[in-house]
A protein has these predicted regions:
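Hydrophobic/aromatic-enriched cytosolic interaction surfaces used to assemble or bind macromolecules
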Residues: 1-296
Length: 296
């Protein structure tokens, strides 16, 4: 049960399949010389994504969907698969430390202590992964992904039942970042239903991750999050963001590009993939496949 960076895991042979889960359905890819993509919608109410409560509301429907996508995979020897969870099912934070211990146990203990006041669930029993980056003025920035163990386990369970081993688990936005240019100071705004994930990255280093449920997926509600984010960037990083990447805006992408460019004074473009336009329910999967292509 691991939530981890993609690059360190992609040094090994890629898994047989990869799945991205959303309330709308499950996006899947059979990984080989050429990836075979599929998407199976879920009945409304099967999942309700949250970092605080049960996500799988209809386990039987979820299990049937997983088995349908797995096909003959379930009849073979148990194989590793990659599992991409919804952003809103976990919390991603970037913590800065004046000094960061070398011992992994001390690191984990220090991180959990820092998160106790900001994470609305029990951090001691939660599934957690993290990695360190060089920070400003000699500090260490640590990217932390944490989720209640019960939530992660419920997402994993149908895949294990179907004869698969979720050997790599990550979140949609982290996987989707593999589609973003690794240059300059950029912002990714990823919309999935009413959940907006905003990721600030300076070249390959994460600086800020926000994931919140909006009152509605309207332009006004998205702008109300982006404006203070861009102010934060300028105030804390000392310069303006150079590019805003959009994902999940669907038919409203062109309107969003024009409006955000005008209101934020930044270059705006959609997130792109060689395998098609990344959408609100498959951007993480396409990013993961891009990583495999780049690292193999």
């Amino acid at each position: 049960m691991i939530i981890d960076k993609l690059k360190s895991l992609l040094q090994e042979a890629p898994p047989a399949m990869a799945f991205e889960i959303s309330e709308a359905g499950i996006a899947a890819a059979r990984i080989g010389a050429r990836a075979e993509l599929d998407f199976l919608p879920l009945k409304p109410g099967t999942l309700c994504v949250s970092p605080l409560k049960e996500n799988v509301l209809d386990p039987d429907e979820f299990v049937m969907a997983v088995r349908s996508l797995a096909g003959t995979q379930a009849a073979r020897k148990r194989r590793d698969v990659a599992l991409i969870l919804p952003d809103f099912s976990a919390r991603i934070s970037v913590l800065d430390f004046d000094s960061f211990p070398k011992d992994p146990k001390e690191q984990a203990s220090l991180i959990r202590f820092r998160l106790k006041r900001s994470v609305p669930f029990d951090v001691e029993s939660a599934a957690m992964s993290y990695w360190a980056q060089s920070g400003a003025k000699g500090k260490t920035d640590v990217v932390v992904v944490i989720a209640p163990l019960e939530i992660v386990s419920r997402y994993e369970s149908p895949f294990r039942t179907a004869g698969m081993n979720p050997g790599m688990i990550t979140t949609s936005c982290l996987a989707a970042l593999e589609l973003a240019p690794e240059a300059g100071l950029s912002v990714l705004a990823k919309l999935t239903g009413r959940v907006l994930t905003v990721v600030v990255r300076d070249k390959i280093q994460l600086k800020l991750v926000r994931c919140l449920e909006l009152p509605s997926p309207s332009m006004e509600d998205v702008v109300s999050v982006l404006v203070p984010t861009f102010v934060y960037i300028e105030d804390n990083l000392g310069r303006r963001a150079e590019k805003l990447l959009l994902c999940g805006f669907g038919a409203s992408t062109a309107e969003a590009e024009s409006r955000f460019a005008e209101e934020l004074g930044v270059e705006v473009e959609p997130l792109r993939s060689p395998l098609g336009t990344p959408g609100e329910n498959n951007a993480g999967l396409l990013g993961y496949l891009r990583s495999i292509a780049k690292n193999n």
